[in-house]
C-alpha cells in the first residue's frame, strides 16, 4: 500500500527525482515552476528515517535553477542537476557549491564497482562522466 509522506506546501512545486545513498538517508529534488521571479529559493527534501518523514533543506537562491536530477555517492556527498548546470554538497546538504553538470541535467546515476570505486553519469543536453 502506498501512503503520502511528503508534499510541498507551496504552489507550483513538485517532487521530481530521488536518491537513497543508504537505507535510512534519502534526498528528493523539488522543482519549482513559480512564475513569480521574486521567488528564488530552491530546495531539496531529505529523510533520515528511511522515508517516513522529510525535511526541506535550502539548495540555492536562484529562480532560474530549476532542479532536475539528483544523485548521492554516500549520505554526505551528492549532486543536484539544474536547468543551468548543477550543485554539489559534501556535508549532507548543509552547503552547496556550483559544479558543471552540463545544461538541463535531468538524471544523475552514481555507481560503485566491486572494488568500491565510484563513477557516475549526469545526463541532460550533454552526457557528463564523474
Predicted ranges, named:
Residues 109-130:
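Blade-level signature of beta-propeller repeat domains, shared across WD40, Kelch, NHL, RCC1
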Residues 40-42, 84, 118:
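Repetitive beta-architecture junctions, highlighting loop-to-beta-strand starts
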Residues 1-10, 42-58, 86-103, 126-130:
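Asp-box/BNR beta-propeller loop motif
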Residues 13-19, 65-69, 104-111:
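Repeated scaffold domains used in trafficking and secretory/extracellular systems
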Residues 61-85:
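Loop/turn-rich, solvent-exposed surfaces of beta-rich toroidal or solenoidal domains
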Residues 33-37, 127-128:
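Short glycine/acidic-enriched loop and turn motifs that connect beta-strands
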Residues 24-28, 76-79, 116-121:
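Entry beta-strands of beta-propeller and related beta-repeat scaffolds
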Residues 29-32, 82, 124:
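Recurrent small/Gly-Pro-centered beta-turn motifs in extracellular repeat architectures
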Amino acid at each position: 500500500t502506498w501512503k503520502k509522506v511528503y508534499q510541498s506546501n507551496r504552489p507550483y512545486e513538485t517532487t521530481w527525482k530521488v536518491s537513497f545513498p543508504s537505507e535510512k538517508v534519502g534526498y528528493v529534488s523539488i522543482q519549482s515552476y513559480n512564475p513569480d521571479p521574486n521567488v528564488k529559493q530552491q530546495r531539496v527534501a531529505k529523510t533520515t528515517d528511511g522515508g517516513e518523514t522529510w525535511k526541506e533543506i535550502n539548495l540555492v537562491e536562484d529562480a532560474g535553477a530549476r532542479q532536475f536530477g539528483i544523485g548521492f555517492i554516500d549520505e554526505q556527498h551528492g549532486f543536484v542537476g539544474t536547468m543551468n548546470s548543477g550543485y554539489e554538497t559534501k556535508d549532507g546538504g548543509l552547503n552547496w557549491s556550483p559544479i558543471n553538470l552540463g545544461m538541463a541535467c535531468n538524471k544523475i546515476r552514481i555507481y560503485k564497482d566491486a572494488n568500491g570505486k565510484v563513477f557516475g553519469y549526469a545526463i541532460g543536453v550533454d552526457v557528463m562522466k564523474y
